[in-house]
Amino acid sequence: MEFGLHLPASSSSVASEDLIRFSRQAEALGFYCITVADHVIVPRNISVPYPYTVDGKYPGTGYHLETLTTMSFLAGATQRIRFLTSVMIAPYRNPVITAKMLASLDVLSQGRVIVGLGVGWMKEEFENLKAPAYQERGRVTDEYIKAFRELWTSEKPSFNGKYCTFSNIIFLPKPVQKPAIPIWIGGHSKQALRRAGELGDGWHPIGGVPTIPLEPDDVRKDLRMLEEYAHAAGRDPREIRVALKGSLFDREKQISPGQRRRFMGSAEEITSDIRDYREAGVDTMIFDVRRASFTETLERMEWMAKEVIAKI
């Protein structure tokens, strides 16, 4: 089983030197990957409820370093750890330029890129970026995935879709990873499972939050559906990775009897949770270890590695 960490980059109080230190410590402790979130802008008025909070309000401040720029910066400061977009909103960017940036980063990092892709949820962000229509974001994402793979694998790339078209071009360099950069599909909806089964190299949902607990039994149920989609597409579902992003845990938080959430509590409790998800079919766990101060965040990362992961 592999383990990853979410990059604590959503605050102006975290300096570039802090992010380098975080990444290097994660690498030294043996973590598999670091995830980087994706928002280009945050509208002041948001009409669509945020799916991961009880009140539907987006909890962010609007501070977001650009995803691929951040990954490039940190890849240059590390040697082995992988970097995962978690998740990049596929319709926000021109697919050919995005494929080029990802391929270039894969070459420069010597094959350490994973692309987590989602369809997005913030309608006003689509509108302000002049992205394809919000209502068509699922179809756009499907098409962009196919376009990415065509550009990354074909010697003479050609694509004729509704949202993306190119032909008679040279696209070099190709990614270091073969046959292509892995694409993990974010989300937990039926369409996300269909997309992962048909097109993804991995399924990358969020779990352990009040609105979407995604208990191990839920994972088993969803994986059965994903497997059906994979078989229908002529694919082997065993080749599709399952990478769950867990909620922020807190080893000091007092949980009332019967009220405990997954990944919260003692090292023993969190270790037990991870084993439950491993048995359900999860092979990669990603955690957010942010605390009030950056020093505490680094301490929490080390605690996670030595007191939890070491016991798995």
Show which residues each predicted segment covers.
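Active-site-adjacent structural elements that line small-molecule/cofactor binding pockets in enzymes
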Residues: 1-312
